[in-house]
Amino acid sequence: MADSTLRGYLKSYVISQQGIDNALLHADQTWQSESSLRLMWQGGSTSTSSINYAWELHYQVNPIFSNQLVEAVNFQSTPPANYRLTDIDPLLIDEARRPVLQNLDRLNIQLQFDQGDLTIGRQAITFGSARIINPTDVFLPYNVTALNTEYRIGVDAIRYQKPLGQLGELDMGFIFGKDGHPDSSAAFIHGKANLAGTDLEFAAMRYANQTLLGAGMQSALGSLGFWLETAVVNGDRRYWRTSTGIDYAFTESMFGMVEYHYNGAGAADSRHYLSTAQTSAYQVGGVFLLGQHYLIPSLSFQATPLTTLGLQAIVNLKDKSSFWSISATHNVLDDLYLGLGYYHFIGKPPVANQTTPFEPGYLAAEYGTSPDAVYAQLSYYF
């Protein structure tokens, strides 16, 4: 016997972004509205046989309106072409200031055996022990400025997950790139276990002629939560990425965390940020931070049973630039939420090329070229 459900959400954002005028970019003040309608149809068998199945289909459409062609900060979560065998045209309506984007984000079937689950099709795949930046998570992670990150971007894969005891799992699969070409595809094996109350993870991946080996752990240090995640990548170049941090519940309504992230793929000098962003680590390896050393504090506060406040900063410790985000969310009705937010960027502005004025300059700081922005959000779930 089969059963299915249809649910979804409608989210609308209104964003105001400051004007900007520096050596690399000029844009007037930008007003933008973006809506996101996501339909989620899923179901499966309800029999007691040794083989059951489940399936899901998610389709999302995003109408956007902007008064400017230039967007200095990327608020969208549109998936790139990486790790999809083929795809529908992401542009449903191609108009410069009024595009309509679409995304077939899930289309898979899962065969559920006594020994484990086999999932075939477009699905979400994510790894990692860290809370904010995951070194072992290379398959389409969100940029930190994206607003709608509720559902992870789907990739085309064949994946097998086998439970190991009560808390362990062996997870392996193949992810298809464009046209199934080996150079754009990936393979992975990932394991989880629990040893004396400590959650352990390991990962091995091969993607775009790069090899990743990683491990992670989560545990408790008294009243603190602790995590450590690290990965080394060998390919075009060799680099390490590591995240470690702690979290703490100050009260029943206030929760804080801080994470340090080392990004060996990043540039040691801000002059090389733009060229570094063109390397394979950024194009196919899930890296988006341009520098090397970061401190990321975060604080959330339950002001009332229906209102949550949040504060987070990403601080580049080398060039002293930072990205701050402040948010407030209020549960208006059972399925209706109102949100407000503010993005604030601190950093030295980019520097013009004094020797050859026809060539672009360079970034003096990672967040020095980004204008501040405010947004309002209304979300309805059905």
Language model segments and positions:
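Outer-membrane beta-barrel "beta-signal"
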Residues: 295, 301, 330, 336-337, ...
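Transmembrane beta-strand segments of Gram-negative outer membrane beta-barrel proteins
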Residues: 2-21, 25, 51-53, 168
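Repeated loop/turn-to-beta-strand initiation elements of outer-membrane beta-barrel proteins
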Residues: 4-6, 47-51, 115-118, 167-170, ...
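Residues that define the transmembrane beta-barrel architecture of outer-membrane proteins
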Residues: 27-37, 100-105, 112, 152-156, ...
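Detector for outer-membrane/organellar transmembrane beta-barrel domains
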Residues: 218-314
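Residue-level signature of outer-membrane beta-barrel architecture
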Residues: 4, 41-45, 111-113, 162-164, ...
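Outer membrane beta-barrel
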Residues: 49-169, 347
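Transmembrane beta-barrel strands of outer-membrane/channel proteins
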Residues: 8-16, 53-59, 120-122, 172-176, ...
